[in-house]
C-alpha cells in the first residue's frame, strides 16, 4: 500500500509497518513506554523516545495540525495541543523527552494502529508509538521525533539501567530517595563526603504533573532534571 511518498504494510499483529520512504527501504522499530532492550544492531539507527528508526522524524511545535492514517485508509486530522513524557532504554542508553501530543477519544483511538504514519501536510513526520489514558473517554497520542528547544529531551548512558518510582504526596527528591522537604536538605549535605567510587544510578520519579530525573554516584546526586508530565506508562503497570 502507498500514501504520498511512503509504502507500508499491515503485519500479523495488526500494526502498520513502514517499508519504504522515497523508494528507499525504511526501518522502524517501536518500543513500549519505558521498555529496555539489548540489541546492538539498533544502535546504528536514530532513536527518539519510543522508537528506533532509519528515518529522521521532523521537529514539530505545539498547535501543529497533523494527519494520522486510520484503519480504513483515511487521514484523521488532529491538533498537537498537549505534552507528555516518554522514554526507552536501548543498550544502556536512556532516551527521553517531552513530546507534543494530541487528544483522541475512544472512537478515534479504535481507528488507529500502532505504527500508523503521521503527516504534516504530505510529509511523514512520525508514527503512532502508543496511547496514554487520561480520562474515561480521553487518550494522549504522543508524537515522537526531534524536539524543539523549549522542550527538554536527551540521552544518557546508564550502565545500571533506570529505576522508575512514583512520587508520594508532599515529597521532595534528592539523588535516589524521596523525603519530606524539611529532611531533604540535611540528607543532601550528608552525601557530600561519600565515597567517589560508588555505583552510578539513574532514577526517574514521577507524578501526574511532573517528572524528575536524577543521575547519582551512590547516594550523591550529580544531576537533577525537572520537567512536565504526565509519564506515558505501559499497558502493564509495573512501576512502583
From Swiss-Prot:
Q: Which UniProt keywords apply?
A: Hydrolase, Nuclease
Q: What HAMAP family does the record point to?
A: Poxins
Q: Which residues form the active site?
A: 46, 181, 185
Identify the EC number(s): 3.1.-.-
Molecular functions per Gene Ontology: 2',3'-cyclic GMP-AMP binding; nuclease activity
Q: Give a yes or no for keyword Hydrolase in this entry.
A: yes
Record text on subunit structure and interactions? Homodimer.
This chain's protein is named Poxin
Amino acid at each position: 500500500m502507498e500514501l504520498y511518498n511512503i509504502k507500508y504494510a499491515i503485519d500479523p499483529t495488526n500494526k502498520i509497518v513502514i517499508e519504504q520512504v522515497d523508494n528507499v527501504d525504511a526501518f522502524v522499530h517501536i518500543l513500549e513506554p519505558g521498555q529496555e532492550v539489548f540489541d546492538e544492531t539498533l544502535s546504528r539507527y536514530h532513536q527518539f523516545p519510543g522508537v528506533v528508526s532509519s528515518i529522521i522524524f521532523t521537529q514539530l511545535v505545539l498547535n501543529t495540525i497533523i494527519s494520522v492514517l486510520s484503519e480504513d485508509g483515511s487521514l484523521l486530522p488532529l491538533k498537537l495541543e498537549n505534552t507528555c513524557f516518554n522514554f526507552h532504554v536501548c543498550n544502556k542508553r536512556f532516551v527521553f523527552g517531552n513530546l507534543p501530543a494530541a487528544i483522541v477519544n475512544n472512537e478515534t483511538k479504535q481507528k488507529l494502529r500502532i505504527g500508523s504514519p503521521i503527516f504534516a501536510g504530505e510529509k511523514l513526520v512520525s508514527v503512532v508509538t502508543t496511547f496514554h489514558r487520561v480520562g474515561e473517554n480521553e487518550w494522549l497520542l504522543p508524537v515522537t521525533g526531534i524536539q524543539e528547544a523549549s522542550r527538554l529531551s536527551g540521552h544518557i548512558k546508564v550502565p545500571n539501567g533506570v529505576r522508575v518510582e512514583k512520587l508520594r504526596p508532599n515529597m521532595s527528591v534528592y539523588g535516589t530517595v524521596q523525603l519530606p522537604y524539611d529532611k531533604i536538605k540535611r540528607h543532601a549535605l550528608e552525601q557530600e563526603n561519600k565515597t567517589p567510587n560508588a555505583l552510578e544510578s539513574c532514577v526517574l520519579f514521577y507524578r501526574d504533573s511532573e517528572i524528575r530525573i536524577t543521575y547519582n554516584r551512590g547516594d550523591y546526586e550529580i544531576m537533577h532534571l525537572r520537567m512536565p508530565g504526565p509519564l506515558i506508562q505501559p499497558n502493564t503497570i509495573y512501576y512502583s
